[in-house]
């Protein structure tokens, strides 16, 4: 008896999700579509093996081949980013950040990170998160006129609050970040500099965004998003920080590593190092910029900061009849997947928001080009401006199916 026959309820849910991914235009900026190699590695027998510790220094026997896999992931990550040290064990970006805080700080120390409505992440000091509960957290905002990072404003705030650690990097910021400016601020106030490049790591790896590696004291990232790997985390740093970061990950914040996921990371890092991946990463940016440009020519909606330098953008809906939650649900109904997102100086709750976030990694993986990305922008605005016109919504839904049928997931290796 096969899986489908043994457990039809679970099989059915997985099959339904597979169909949803096949039929929808996926614009959640933190999502992508992994290769067959990544899925094979992650679904391998490595899931059976417990391996507390690090290569060559485990607490269990039978880890000789696990060590090979993890060392491959470490070496490939170091080469990909030009780093002296890499830890591939964090289960997620959030746990990578948690381990860094544990390595460099003590509870009650002050951290300074980007606010949520400016595009920051929960783990950058949000009061509802461990980072805002265990540490004395402050947030910097964007310049209210330009909607860009204002390094003079950040410097003034850093001088005032005197953080032990400054977090640079974002979850929803569409412009190039000046790592050297952050380094200068951190040096002036005597703070460590941590960069969370989770969203842009694939662009950094291909030289399409400046790299923080070697500038920051420590760099964290997820391994999915623009890296197109399995869901997981990664920490990069200088060799001198290896011991305290390793200890903070294990045994400090985690137990046994997920070696099947680490195998998926190794597979992804290999793919990310190939020339074709740089072409792919460039197309991600090209598609995002085409989409942002199209929005600028359409009524009612506005791209925060006026455009994008990377893979994502936040769409300000405050001049429409919809909030972010309503827009997300409406777009879901026409098979376009997005997520609600706070805009700078947000006035609505995090459960509603005044914007939506859009990203192009997944559609670029499917093979969408710039013209198709522009069309997707037009379909989004058409939907948002006609929320109750079933004829319009039906037409959009049909066009989405045509676009996704032209780029089936089955074509991917």
Curated annotation (Swiss-Prot):
**Where is this chain's protein located in or outside the cell?**
Cytoplasm
* One cellular component term from this protein's GO annotations in UniProt: cytosol
Binding sites annotated in the UniProt record for (6S)-5,6,7,8-tetrahydrofolate: 116, 120-122, 349-351
- Cofactor(s) listed: pyridoxal 5'-phosphate
One Pfam family from the record: SHMT
Q: Which UniProt keywords apply?
A: Amino-acid biosynthesis, Cytoplasm, One-carbon metabolism, Pyridoxal phosphate, Transferase
The protein's enzyme class:
transferase
Catalytic activity reads: (6R)-5,10-methylene-5,6,7,8-tetrahydrofolate + glycine + H2O = (6S)-5,6,7,8-tetrahydrofolate + L-serine
Major location category of this protein: cytoplasm
Pathway in which this enzyme or protein is active? One-carbon metabolism; tetrahydrofolate interconversion; Amino-acid biosynthesis; glycine biosynthesis; glycine from L-serine: step 1/1
GO annotations under biological process? glycine biosynthetic process from serine; tetrahydrofolate interconversion
Amino-acid biosynthesis as UniProt keyword? yes
Q: Where is this site: Plays an important role in substrate specificity?
A: 224
Q: Does the keyword Cytoplasm apply?
A: yes
The EC number on file is 2.1.2.1
Molecular-function GO terms, alphabetical = glycine hydroxymethyltransferase activity; pyridoxal phosphate binding
In this chain, where does the modification N6-(pyridoxal phosphate)lysine occur? 225
* Record text on subunit structure and interactions: Homodimer.
Q: What does this protein do?
A: Catalyzes the reversible interconversion of serine and glycine with tetrahydrofolate (THF) serving as the one-carbon carrier. This reaction serves as the major source of one-carbon groups required for the biosynthesis of purines, thymidylate, methionine, and other important biomolecules. Also exhibits THF-independent aldolase activity toward beta-hydroxyamino acids, producing glycine and aldehydes, via a retro-aldol mechanism.
Tell me which family the UniProt entry assigns to this protein.
Belongs to the SHMT family.
Official protein name in the record: Serine hydroxymethyltransferase
What gene is this protein translated from?
A: glyA
């Amino acid at each position: 008896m096969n899986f489908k026959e043994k457990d039809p309820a679970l099989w059915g849910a997985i099959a339904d999700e597979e169909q949803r991914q096949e039929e929808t235009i996926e614009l959640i900026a933190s999502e992508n579509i992994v290769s067959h190699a990544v899925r094979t590695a992650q679904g391998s027998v490595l899931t059976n093996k417990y391996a507390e510790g690090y290569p060559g220094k485990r607490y269990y026997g039978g880890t000789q081949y696990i060590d090979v896999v993890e060392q491959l992931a470490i070496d490939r990550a170091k080469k990909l980013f030009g780093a002296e040290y890499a830890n591939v064990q964090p289960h997620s970006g959030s746990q990578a950040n948690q381990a860094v805080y544990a390595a460099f700080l003590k509870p009650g120390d002050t951290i300074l990170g980007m606010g949520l409505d400016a595009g920051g992440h929960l783990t950058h000091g949000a009061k509802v998160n461990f980072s805002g509960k265990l540490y004395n957290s402050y947030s910097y905002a964007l310049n209210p006129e330009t909607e860009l990072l204002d390094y003079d404003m950040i410097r003034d705030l850093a001088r005032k609050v005197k953080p032990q650690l400054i977090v640079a990097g974002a979850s929803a910021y569409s412009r190039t970040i000046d790592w050297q400016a952050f380094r200068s601020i951190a040096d002036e106030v005597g703070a460590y500099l941590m960069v969370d490049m989770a969203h842009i790591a694939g662009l950094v790896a291909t030289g399409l965004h400046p790299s923080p590696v070697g500038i920051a004291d420590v760099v964290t990232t997820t391994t999915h998003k623009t890296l197109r790997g399995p869901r997981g985390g990664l920490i990069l740093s200088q060799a001198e920080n290896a011991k305290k970061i390793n200890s903070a990950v294990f045994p400090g914040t985690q137990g046994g590593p997920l070696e099947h996921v680490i195998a998926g990371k190794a597979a992804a890092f290999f793919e990310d190092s190939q020339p074709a991946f740089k072409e792919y990463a460039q197309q991600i940016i090209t598609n995002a910029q085409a989409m942002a440009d199209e929005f600028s020519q359409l009524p009612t909606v506005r791209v925060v900061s006026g455009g994008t330098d990377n893979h994502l953008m936040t769409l300000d809906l405050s001049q429409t009849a919809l909030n972010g939650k309503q827009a997300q649900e409406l777009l879901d109904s026409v098979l376009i997947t997005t997520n609600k997102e706070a805009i700078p100086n947000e006035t609505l709750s995090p459960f509603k928001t005044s914007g939506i976030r859009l990203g192009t990694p997944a559609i670029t993986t499917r093979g969408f080009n710039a013209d198709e990305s522009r069309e997707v922008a037009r379909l989004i605005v058409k939907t948002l401006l006609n929320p109750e016109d079933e004829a319009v919504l039906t037409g959009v839904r049909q066009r989405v199916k045509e676009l996704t049928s032209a780029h089936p997931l089955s074509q991917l290796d």
